[in-house]
């Protein structure tokens, strides 16, 4: 019977996920995943983007209360913006909550000038992430007060959903709330190569958050959500031989058991390794670059070719491999074949 695990172990795997921050606050990151099977860049990129933009927990202002104001169609003398504009500006306040329960924070200010989110008395449980965000503009000597109710939630909710059973007190105005800490997600898929095969996928994602969590954490949470949802579809038990490969621990990466003649090297590089009796990747990575360059007919071009391939497996020249070579290397290579093919 065909091993069930071949369905997933036969696919190329990567342990290489790189994160590159390109903003001084670390709120923007470039995430690169490679190599992936053809088509998986688009599959994973689209799924991750949808989850990142819809399903993460965050905090937001869900209602406001301004003395003397009963609804959003009002205006306040001495305040440049009407209530509808103030509500739009309040929706742009980005917050982080350190507790799960709702909190009420307060704003008291006197004109003239712009009133910003940083003037809010947030206390210890709520943190304002964009303190320079303008809420309204006041005339000279104009006093302005407002209470803001903050809650933890998911995604985007309308004001009608934030009015708990229509039980908000008179004068408290429910507003739309964007809880999601992820502000934007874009991705693109490029070709990458392993040896002579050039049509593997490279997934490049650009993720920006509001500072509540780092992009790396957001990506991890999105992947965990997908994992939890997809688990429902796994309705079979793994075969014993599949479990055996998983539970028998190796003191080194199973990739080291892969034969070098399976790497699709150039003819020159492959012949040099064969003539030097280098059979497995484990034999190869124990050599230093200097050792390799002393190999007859092996030049810098061949060295760079092999270094690039090893990097795909998170390997390099000059590695210290414990217990290499194992006595039963041929048997182990067969047993772990699904792990690296």
Swiss-Prot record:
Keyword Protein biosynthesis: no
EC number(s) on file: 2.7.7.6
GO biological process assignments: DNA-templated transcription
Catalytic activity: RNA(n) + a ribonucleoside 5'-triphosphate = RNA(n+1) + diphosphate
Cellular component terms per the entry's GO annotation: cytoplasm; DNA-directed RNA polymerase complex
Any GO molecular function: DNA-directed RNA polymerase activity
Family matches, as Gene3D superfamilies: 5' to 3' exonuclease, C-terminal subdomain, DNA-directed RNA polymerase, insert domain, RNA polymerase, RBP11-like subunit
Source domain of life: Bacteria
Pfam families per UniProt: RNA_pol_A_bac, RNA_pol_A_CTD, RNA_pol_L
Cited CDD domains: RNAP_alpha_NTD (cd06928)
Leading EC class: transferase
Region listing for Alpha N-terminal domain (alpha-NTD), in residue ranges: 1-237
Keywords: DNA-directed RNA polymerase, Nucleotidyltransferase, Transcription, Transferase
Free-text function comment from the UniProt entry: DNA-dependent RNA polymerase catalyzes the transcription of DNA into RNA using the four ribonucleoside triphosphates as substrates.
Domain description: The N-terminal domain is essential for RNAP assembly and basal transcription, whereas the C-terminal domain is involved in interaction with transcriptional regulators and with upstream promoter elements.
Subunit details: Homodimer. The RNAP catalytic core consists of 2 alpha, 1 beta, 1 beta' and 1 omega subunit. When a sigma factor is associated with the core the holoenzyme is formed, which can initiate transcription.
Protein's UniProt name: DNA-directed RNA polymerase subunit alpha
